[in-house]
Curated annotation (Swiss-Prot):
Zinc finger extent (NR C4-type): 16-36, 52-78
Main location: nucleus
The protein's name: Nuclear receptor subfamily 2 group E member 1
Keyword Amino-acid biosynthesis (UniProt): no
Pfam families linked: Hormone_recep, zf-C4
GO molecular function, one term: nuclear receptor activity
Gene expressing this chain: NR2E1
Keyword terms, alphabetized: Activator, Developmental protein, DNA-binding, Metal-binding, Nucleus, Receptor, Repressor, Transcription, Transcription regulation, Zinc, Zinc-finger
Region annotation Required for transcriptional repression: where it falls in the sequence: 341-385
GO BP terms, alphabetized: aggressive behavior; amygdala development; angiogenesis; anterior commissure morphogenesis; apoptotic process; astrocyte cell migration; astrocyte differentiation; behavioral fear response
Amino acid sequence: MSKPAGSTSRILDIPCKVCGDRSSGKHYGVYACDGCSGFFKRSIRRNRTYVCKSGNQGGCPVDKTHRNQCRACRLKKCLEVNMNKDAVQHERGPRTSTIRKQVALYFRGHKEENGAAAHFPSAALPAPAFFTAVTQLEPHGLELAAVSTTPERQTLVSLAQPTPKYPHEVNGTPMYLYEVATESVCESAARLLFMSIKWAKSVPAFSTLSLQDQLMLLEDAWRELFVLGIAQWAIPVDANTLLAVSGMNGDNTDSQKLNKIISEIQALQEVVARFRQLRLDATEFACLKCIVTFKAVPTHSGSELRSFRNAAAIAALQDEAQLTLNSYIHTRYPTQPCRFGKLLLLLPALRSISPSTIEEVFFKKTIGNVPITRLLSDMYKSSDI
């Protein structure tokens, strides 16, 4: 149930002392937005030292639009407005903390007023009833509730905080510069994973299957859903940035493993570029998600071959997804008779990057050695999602 405007936890009339955005209350002694308070906390806890991008320490603009461009000047501004470093150091994380509990807390957060928390663009989608819930889910933006984490190990949930949309350019300069992307990629990856789970739970046909079948489908399709999300929401996949995010380099990683990961990142770049060239709309993405999810093929769990309880129903749902996509393209893009075939031919390329590489690059720093499949199962079963 939504809260009345007067009882919202957002302090709508007091600006952030650092960037001027709307404050969400007092953080470390001053009124600040979630983005600046989170940045300050991470910087102090990790004892970060930043170098000004322009070489003019403190001279870069720190406002709502430019706050992510120079970390050095942003941190300097935080200190200038008297954010309290000691308050960060003395903050105590939960004594007992599980991913399940933190995921539950995450989904108790409320949507930010006026749609400010909707990080991804929405669209009105003329789609059959089978996909109505699927396409309507796409724009959902979820606000992080107050979840404390230990300084040693940020969780996936703690990274899924509201941040601005990725503007493709600001004053002609790409926003996904090295420092910006390094921090933002992990946050975006966390959101994509949450969105994939919430999306699956909201597909009416998906929920009619047994829980075992649902989990098997999700565990097998999460990689493709994740890559589709990267393509759909224009998340940067620059190789240097992704390697920086993962922390891997020639000094700390076996050369064979590093070369494999670099090769798969290049494959990811290629498949994402091919999707972006075709400029898919939200309905096409929704249909493709259903096609890659409803695969009635036995899967392996370790050495065990697992079969679906209702493979026939799953196969029928995939057929319906393909028919819906074909019909939609025929109506929406009548001058592109080959478009349907081109999209289907792209789907195998979604598996060109291995699940282990995605985990290593996008999630290792946030969830450690917790297997993504276990995390998916745990979150999917949560009633809070």
